[in-house]
Amino acid sequence: MDGHPPGTAEVDLGPLGLDGGGHLLVARALAPLPPGGRLRVTGSDGHLGVHLQAWARRRGHGVEGTTVVRGAADRQRLAGAVRAGEPGAVAGRADATWGLAARGALVEAGAPPLAGADLDERAVVWTELAPKLYAQAAAGQWDPATAIDWDPPALPGEVEAAVVQVMTYLVENEQAALAVPARFLGRIHPHFREVVQFLATQVADEARHVEVFTRRALLCGGELGISGAGGRASLQTLLDEPDWPTASFLLSALGEGTFLSLLSFLERRAPDPVTARIARLALQDEARHVAFAMGHLGEHLRAAPGLRSRLRAAVLRRHDALASTAGLADSVDDALVVLAAGAFTPAAIGAGWRRVRQLEVEMDEARRRRLVRLGFADAEATELSALHTRNFM
Amino acid sequence: MVTRPLVLGAVAYDAKVVTIWEGFRRYFLARDLPFDFVLYSHYERQVEALVGGQIDVAWNSPLAWVRTRRLAPLARAVAMRDTDRDLTSVVVVRADSPVRTPAELAGRAVGTGAVDSPQGTLLPLALLADTPVEVRRFEVGVGLHGDHVGGERDAARALAAGAVEAACMLDANHLLFSKEGTLPPGGTRVVAVTPHFDHCNFSVVADHDALDRFVTLLLAMDYADPATRPLMDLEGLTAWLPGRTDGYDQLEAAVDRFGFYGPAGEVAAAGYRP
Ligand SMILES: [Fe+2]
Ligand SMILES: [Fe+2]
């Protein structure tokens, strides 16, 4: 072809040395040769001979003068290499030996297998919604500094205190909602890239929620409210759940699902524009978190209907564990009433009270709808919704 | 009867030596070769242990091989890395130096590696043996026979800084120092290159029942095997080859010329304290 006998070739490096990238040209010229093939290297760099033999020796090639005799080490290195699945398709099971490799990468064998990523089955972690929801999440990230007009409102003292109490409650719930996906993130095999990416955005969302609710609590210079023991006990049961589908069910399908009603209520009933705005922004994020959980749980349940009884048992177990605790603290319930009342007159408080009771009805209805969507029978959905924690999350 | 394990000695010139020999030990044990290793702090201690029968095989530097053969004339080299064959060392000057030939280094300062480095000191200095140069040694890792690259790198730094007129180093280290920027790329010129020489080998002085099996298993180590390739990468080879001993004549001559060891293997170099 180039006038060379078969198995031989020639490459001219011009003035380029092997200390300046010349090895790339040599390796490229060697690649198509068979082992034993000969490559004559020419060039004007003063160190070419010295550097060529040093470079070639270390890579298992022979050298005769400035002719490289091709070795096989580069091909041996990739002898047992496999593809980490296909870039456009998700495998049924992700192999630990694929490690952190990009989906579809050619994986050189020999590294230690990926440790700790035990959630490696498509049926357990994947949802077809993941790529779309991740893209939405990436596009929907908002900046707390600019998305909200942080002018302090001038509310009556008791109403402001009620807002602060609700914010105090929200912050600890957001911390739980951050910690749970964060704990599972590292256990999900990175082959399921979009799931990992989505959960990373979920964690980042919760970080913003923690920020904006904290900032609203401190906006008017008051002290933070009470963190009730019952609420924290309820959240601890979420953190303790070691099973991914169960944790996702309790946190997102039930807890964050219930929060959709709560945040929508806060947006509608907020006594000041800052509270309304941050409830609105958090609500948009939470809707994604719930959609993701409903997606992967729905697909998982279709593949393994036995999971349904596991999820049911988890609700009962959690209810029993929390039976001796207060659930939603009086301080939070009262604060919601005052927030929705906007004033301390009997008529306003009465209206606030009715709105909060109506909120609880809405929460229950929405939970039952989601449970039915996950395939629970109507009666079971009613039973389980009623057993959901009084702390909402 | 249970075979006494084959005991190999290696010098702990770097922490990775433990990883390497633990890995090789697993490789041999998995193939029913009873195998242990002992680490030494320097090559003189290892050579004495080999000659004294405390170890069966020594993973020897070329200089350690020279001493082993002087202490035990029947010593053999049973295997070596593909990367141990046909090395060269260079004497380099700055590109703008007036020095064109080794003889023009007369009266000038030449930086070298440690006193006991074959590639960084003994072999390149032998090229200048008839030229009265002022040797400036950079003593890093004395006793490690040049396994530690620090002395050569310090000599290269001194060259770049203008503190010496020339510096001595292995061909591969000249490439390394030029790529990493210790030497300015294209900023140096080679004024002398040694002939090819060989580097490390597995030396033995007495027979052991398992020696043939050790060599067979070593030579069978396959770079295509993902279980052993990381160890071979760490040890810096792509294939083990049978030992050969005709690549050490240059070093034998340099050792005699500089009186590093006596003819019977006694340590004779002035100021050499491993
Ligand atoms: Fe949140
Ligand atoms: Fe959330």
Placement of each model-derived feature along the sequence:
Chain B
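A ligand-binding cleft/hinge motif common to bilobed small-molecule-binding domains
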Residues: W59-A72, A129, R157-G186
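Periplasmic-binding protein-like
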Residues: V2-A10, R81-V93, H145-G146, E180-L218, ...
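Acidic, polar ligand-binding/catalytic clefts
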Residues: A49-E104, D116
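Short, hydrophobic alpha-helical packing/hinge segments within bilobed ligand-binding/sensory domains
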Residues: R45-A49, G151-A158, V164
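N-terminal hydrophobic or amphipathic helices and topogenic motifs
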Residues: M1-Q54, N60-P62, P226-P274
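Conserved functional loop/turn residues at catalytic and ligand-binding sites
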Residues: Q54, A109, A163
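Bilobed "Venus flytrap"/periplasmic-binding protein-like clamshell domains
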Residues: P5-R31, Y40, L63, L87-A155, ...
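Generic structural signal for residues in well-ordered beta-strands
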Residues: F35-F37, V135, V190
